[in-house]
Amino acid sequence: MSIGRRLTASFAGIALTALAACDGVTGVGSRVEPALIIFYRDSSTIVAPDTVSRGEAFTVRIKTFGGGCTREAVRADVAIAGTLAEIRPFNRTQNANACTADLLFLYHTVQVRFDVGGRTVLRVMGEQRGASTGGTNGPALVERAIVVR
């Protein structure tokens, strides 16, 4: 075998080993969890217009909390019933032995449309962490009222 082929084979072996060891690249060893929407004294923000038109879609942007092993916003499920839109954001957390000690904001953007007029509610449902929950998360919700004309 020539030196070039040996080097190529060696580099290929190193690359495969590195990829197999890196869960962040392959997505193996991670879990999708309800997003953290209350972090101690801070709550997620829901950015949406104050007033919208009936039957027209509008954009809603939700700030969630991440950091450490949670570094990616994955999806947000939306369910609309009458004057209530429930939004459930989810983030990806890597399974790791060590994670960074930082706080990140992870943003979720969804489209919402109400077919009824009047006062409506955007309800974001997720998890909270704080003094009352200790080191574990508990259920949480944050709401914002808007007017549909």
Where are these regions (language model features)?
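Short beta-strand segments of immunoglobulin-like
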Residues: V47-V52
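Short tyrosine-centred short linear motifs in exposed loops/low-complexity segments
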Residues: G55, V116-V121
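Sec-dependent bacterial lipoprotein signal peptides
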Residues: M1-D23
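Aromatic/hydrophobic beta-strand junction motif of beta-rich domains
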Residues: V60-G67
